[in-house]
């Protein structure tokens, strides 16, 4: 009996100590907005200077971070990274919306636990109200232990402390169609960022984003009020931030730009945790929030975490932050970026596609307007270059002077030293591992690229498993999607698909990127003879006379010869011109009828001359 009594006292004492320990831990509430750029009064924005009072109040009573950057410009990847505490490229969750099917599910490394799970194991009640969106398999019941019924009624949290919770806001996705007059923004008064056309359509896009932020600000006000009325504010740290930049601006969301990666980041709470009414100007990786959250809870930061405790006595400001862009729904890309105090370095790995390649926003008015302006020659040269121009291997911007990343300094010799330094920083970051260099499985490609609501994949990566009925090297689905005939057996290449500019043409004779602006191939004659090739064909010949027609222009006189893998098909001399000429080169029937597995075009001319090709087409004479 005495032994039982002693055991009971020990258990009571332990439970009391546990209660006391938990009571001293702060509650932590993340207010997590979708698709939101830092266009608030507290960030110096004039349009919203008096229209975001609740966010501004958080800043005045807490800490505002001026230069906070997410690890990726798309929701699922950023959310996967932050909840794990590590860049998604390290553990394979870098492709947007992975794990769509049983065959493509991604599992975290054995030891990894999600942030809420770690907190739950240390006595926290954890919840998530709204979107999760993680690119890997996870168990909701082991991660989130409490269901918040209403984001506007936090009273049920009073008896569920300490808690770690997330309240998800719609941010840029807020429906602003039926907005009250007090929240509306006149499109005529906004400033359209310099990397967009300044017309009524983009003025409306910018105005809508301001309105969306105002809606969120009202909701944040209600949340803060609930915290105060329930007494929770006395021991609750509140964090406001976003997963990436504005959703309806084409060079914000999904792009490795300042607009796509810089987000609002504000913390408020009890005095014990940070200095109130302070501003931080050091470069912040939003992965730091994961580490800082654990530090607030008094929990050791796991070995795989890349973030730092932002308020540690030993904290040292970062020299740089990195970011990555990979597949986004059906749109395949691979880009890496380094941001230092003054510069942003961008490394593009897939140069056969333009920046504005086919994507989920193609049917939006603003995307259609951009294409319309380009097609009709009404887009400025700088906007043509940004959205539809040849993809550069490297981009380098002084973002303190040029935050909209208009002027690429990568080829300016004055910046060679800085450029070399940023290359080295990228190498340093990549040395910790990047699974983006590994090709996606066919199963994953099929899950994302085939007739989904967001679009049809037109990148060359999808071609490896698709059927090509007529042997022209272009799959049936690709041809149908690009308004070609998949059964005509005709070689026809227009170079107007932004997701695969070269349409399979390649060359080993020139250092140039064959992919030119949307609608063109272009390359320099690095030597007097350059051959471009189209492999992967299965052409059976024809009973009628055939020819190749090529629309091109060049500053050099050229000798042009066409070959199949069985011999020469034809040749023609070209006289230099500054306008496109339609050339017709008759095909030698006997050679053509032997069938073709490849076609090559030999250009002979003055070294360093530029050649631009509008289309290559097989025709019947």
Task: Name what the model sees in each region.
Residues 21-389, 403-424, 438, 456-464:
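Formylglycine-dependent sulfatase
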Residues 399-401, 612-621:
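Extracellular, beta-strand-rich glycan-interacting domains
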Residues 24-26, 33, 37-38, 64, ...:
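Long, internal low-complexity/basic segments
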Residues 590-601:
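Noncatalytic modules at the cell exterior or secretory-pathway interfaces
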Residues 1-25:
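Bacterial Sec-dependent N-terminal signal peptides
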Residues 28, 65, 492, 582, ...:
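Hydrophobic residues on conserved beta-strands that form the core of alpha/beta folds
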Residues 523-590, 607-612, 618:
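Extracellular ligand-binding interfaces
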Residues 600-608:
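Short beta-strand-plus-loop segments that form exposed binding edges in beta-rich domains
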């Amino acid at each position: 009996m005495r032994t039982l009594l002693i055991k009971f006292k020990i258990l009571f004492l332990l439970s009391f100590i546990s209660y006391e320990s938990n009571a001293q831990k702060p509650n932590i509430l993340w207010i997590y907005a979708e698709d939101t750029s830092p266009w608030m009064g507290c960030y110096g924005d004039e349009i919203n200077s008096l229209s975001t009072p609740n966010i501004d109040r958080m800043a005045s009573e807490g800490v505002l971070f001026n230069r906070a950057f997410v690890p990726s410009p798309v929701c699922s990847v950023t959310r996967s990274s932050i909840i794990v505490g590590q860049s998604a490229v390290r553990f394979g969750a870098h492709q947007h919306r992975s794990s769509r099917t049983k065959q493509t599910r991604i599992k975290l490394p054995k030891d990894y636990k999600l942030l809420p799970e770690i907190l739950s194991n240390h006595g926290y009640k954890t919840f998530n109200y709204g979107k999760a969106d993680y690119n890997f398999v996870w168990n909701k019941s082991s991660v989130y232990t409490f269901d918040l019924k209403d984001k506007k009624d936090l009273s049920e949290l009073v008896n569920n402390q300490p808690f770690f919770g997330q309240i998800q806001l719609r941010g840029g996705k807020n429906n602003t169609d039926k907005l009250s007059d007090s929240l509306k923004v006149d499109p005529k008064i906004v400033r359209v960022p310099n990397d967009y056309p300044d017309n009524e359509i983009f003025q409306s896009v910018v105005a809508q984003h301001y309105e969306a932020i105002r809606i969120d600000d009202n909701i944040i006000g209600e949340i803060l009020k609930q915290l105060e009325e329930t007494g929770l504010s006395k021991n609750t740290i509140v964090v406001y931030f976003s997963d990436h930049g504005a959703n309806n601006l084409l060079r914000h969301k999904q792009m490795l730009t300042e607009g796509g990666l810089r987000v609002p980041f504000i913390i408020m709470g009890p005095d014990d945790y940070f200095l109130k009414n302070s501003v931080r100007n050091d470069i912040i990786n939003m992965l730091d929030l994961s580490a800082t959250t654990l530090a607030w809870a008094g929990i050791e930061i796991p070995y795989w975490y890349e973030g730092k405790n932002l308020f540690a006595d030993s904290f040292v400001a970062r020299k740089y932050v990195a970011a990555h862009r990979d597949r986004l729904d059906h749109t395949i890309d691979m880009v890496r970026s380094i941001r230092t105090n003054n510069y942003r370095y961008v490394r593009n790995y897939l140069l056969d596609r333009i920046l504005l390649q086919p994507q989920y926003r193609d049917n939006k008015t603003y995307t259609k307007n951009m294409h319309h302006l380009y097609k009709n020659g009404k887009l400025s040269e700088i906007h043509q270059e940004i959205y539809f121009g040849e993809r550069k291997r490297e981009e380098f911007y002084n973002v303190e002077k040029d935050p909209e990343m208009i002027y690429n300094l990568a080829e300016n010799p004055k910046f060679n030293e800085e450029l070399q330094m940023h290359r080295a920083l990228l190498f340093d970051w990549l040395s910790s591992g990047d699974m983006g260099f590994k090709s996606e499985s066919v199963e994953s490609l099929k899950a994302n690229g085939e007739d989904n609501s967001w679009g049809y994949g037109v990148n060359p990566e999808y071609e490896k498993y698709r059927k090509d009925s007529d042997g022209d090297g272009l799959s049936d689905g690709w041809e149908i999607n690009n308004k070609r005939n998949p059964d005509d057996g005709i070689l026809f290449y227009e170079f107007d698909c932004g997701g695969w500019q070269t349409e399979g043409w390649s060359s080993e004779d020139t250092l140039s990127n064959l992919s030119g602006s949307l609608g063109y191939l272009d390359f320099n004659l690095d030597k007097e003879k350059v051959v471009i090739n189209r492999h992967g064909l299965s052409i059976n010949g024809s009973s009628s006379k055939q020819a190749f027609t090529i629309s091109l222009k060049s500053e050099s006189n050229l000798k042009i010869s066409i070959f199949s893998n069985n011999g020469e098909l034809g040749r023609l001399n070209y006289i230099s011109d500054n306008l496109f000429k339609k050339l017709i080169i008759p095909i030698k029937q006997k050679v053509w009828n032997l069938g073709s597995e490849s076609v090559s075009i030999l250009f002979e001319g003055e070294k360093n001359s530029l050649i631009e090709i509008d289309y290559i087409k097989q025709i019947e004479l």
